[in-house]
């Protein structure tokens, strides 16, 4: 038994294929989905969605969204997504380093700047993790 997994961004379908397992970056932590999972609707955070298909893991950087699980179908609607195998690792490292420096340089009383820098940092971290260049932070 397997899952049917669809990852859909506003501009394209990122993934649509059978899988044995999915790990979602929910707003409350990592959420593992296996065949036979109970129906579920969950908000997603910025992070890495992982899909196990044909004994291989595929990482997808996602920037928030929602996931629905029902009858062995996992439908993931995301604000933006990028497959890890399509991300240039060196570019992702440079973007992460730049976002980290920007976050460190924001003044403590600059709430809007801090928010924007934090969002950029989280996006860059998710992309780097999906590309395989960062295990954990």
UniProtKB/Swiss-Prot annotation:
<dbReference type="GO" id="GO:0046933">
    <property type="term" value="F:proton-transporting ATP synthase activity, rotational mechanism"/>
</dbReference>
<comment type="subunit">
    <text>F-type ATPases have 2 components, CF(1) - the catalytic core - and CF(0) - the membrane proton channel. CF(1) has five subunits: alpha(3), beta(3), gamma(1), delta(1), epsilon(1). CF(0) has three main subunits: a, b and c.</text>
</comment>
<comment type="similarity">
    <text>Belongs to the ATPase epsilon chain family.</text>
</comment>
<dbReference type="GO" id="GO:0031676">
    <property type="term" value="C:plasma membrane-derived thylakoid membrane"/>
</dbReference>
<keyword id="KW-0813">Transport</keyword>
<comment type="function">
    <text>Produces ATP from ADP in the presence of a proton gradient across the membrane.</text>
</comment>
<keyword id="KW-0066">ATP synthesis</keyword>
<protein>
    <recommendedName>
        <fullName>ATP synthase epsilon chain</fullName>
    </recommendedName>
</protein>
<dbReference type="InterPro" id="IPR020546">
    <property type="entry name" value="ATP_synth_F1_dsu/esu_N"/>
</dbReference>
<dbReference type="Pfam" id="PF00401">
    <property type="entry name" value="ATP-synt_DE"/>
</dbReference>
<keyword id="KW-0139">CF(1)</keyword>
<keyword id="KW-0472">Membrane</keyword>
<dbReference type="GO" id="GO:0005524">
    <property type="term" value="F:ATP binding"/>
</dbReference>
<dbReference type="InterPro" id="IPR020547">
    <property type="entry name" value="ATP_synth_F1_esu_C"/>
</dbReference>
<keyword id="KW-0375">Hydrogen ion transport</keyword>
<keyword id="KW-0406">Ion transport</keyword>
<dbReference type="InterPro" id="IPR036771">
    <property type="entry name" value="ATPsynth_dsu/esu_N"/>
</dbReference>
<keyword id="KW-0793">Thylakoid</keyword>
<dbReference type="GO" id="GO:0045259">
    <property type="term" value="C:proton-transporting ATP synthase complex"/>
</dbReference>
<dbReference type="InterPro" id="IPR001469">
    <property type="entry name" value="ATP_synth_F1_dsu/esu"/>
</dbReference>
<dbReference type="Pfam" id="PF02823">
    <property type="entry name" value="ATP-synt_DE_N"/>
</dbReference>
